[in-house]
Amino acid sequence: MKQQLDSSQLLAMLDSSKLLVVCGSGGVGKTTMSAALGALAATHLHKKVLVLTVDPARRLADALGLQAIGNAVVQVDAMAFNEAGVAPQGQLFAAMIDTKASWDDLIHRHAPTPAIAQRVLANALYTNLTERFVHSHDYIAMERLYDVYQSGAYDLVVVDTPPSRNALDVLDAPKRMRDFFNSRLLQLLTTPAQSRVVSLMSKPFFQVADRILGARFLSSITEFFTLFRTMEKGFVERANKVENVLRNTDTKFAVVTTLEVAPAFEAEYLLTELQSRSFSLAALIANRVLPLTLANQTSAALTNDRSLVGPETLQTAAAAAGLPTPSAEQCERVLATLWRAAQDVVAASVVEQSRLDKLSHSCSKSGANVLTAQYVSGEITDMKGIVALGESLSGI
């Protein structure tokens, strides 16, 4: 049976975290929940909290009431909290990743010389990869996460990841970067022409690539990856450091879901994958759950004799409100519709509870908090709604 979570438990989890990575499938309210967790920490804890979104949909700005958001960190005005009816003890900041600008910074940092950095930045393939290749966003997300974590500028960083399995792409990005530098493809593209043996072995590859891509484009590819390989040491060392941060004791993970079929299935998958990667799972948050009191009251009402509420009840209510008196037939149709709707509410609540129980069981070994947020009609687009969402979290 669901009980109100001791707020100190939730705040203790936030207080003990330096990095909170929020995962979930699309459409479950993950971005808003990330903001709500950040706002909750900033409200009750004396902390500088940063909410960092790597979600390409870029919805966090609207939810936090900011005019613009990007690589630059923007502070959420304390007045926004005051208008939501709370006085924050800490501070809340928000930022989102500009993939191209972040890659440019990374190239300048890892290139052995400024001249090589400029050659990489000027390469046409570099521009195409950083602007269009989805996994370039994954890797740079981890770089940005690591930067803000290591800077020590914030006491807590809440990271809003892309939807569901894309979140795992982000978390696996450091390993993919390390594997890339060890890949056969990179060796083929960057092997010196003077190496006769290797050149003969790779000749079929280049003949096919030349026909498909054209000599000029192939030359551009070879130049880019040859230059990129000069930065191998810096990238590999950084990838190792990022992986270590993700497994630190003060790095926690939270999975957000709704209790519909597909999101609940994805949440089950995420829980399994996160635990198999030995990440610290701190919370499962079921969002937009039917209020238990509503389901209980509706269930109790359905146990009453249907005949106790007849057309006369509605006709009397209409007369008291000064409305035209409905016919007995109209009243029967309305009552039948209400009765079916009430049955649907109870049935939906039973299904939700079953799915929540299953997810709770999946969390039992990790000791993660299982939290719920009740269904709210309409979209949350301001700090008042964000603060209310964070404050409404309850446990089971």
Q: Where do the language-model regions lie?
A:
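Nucleotide-state-sensitive switch-loop elements of NTP-binding domains
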Residues: 1-21, 25-28, 33-240
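C-terminal lobe/tail of nucleotide-utilizing enzymes
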Residues: 1-14, 211-226, 236-396
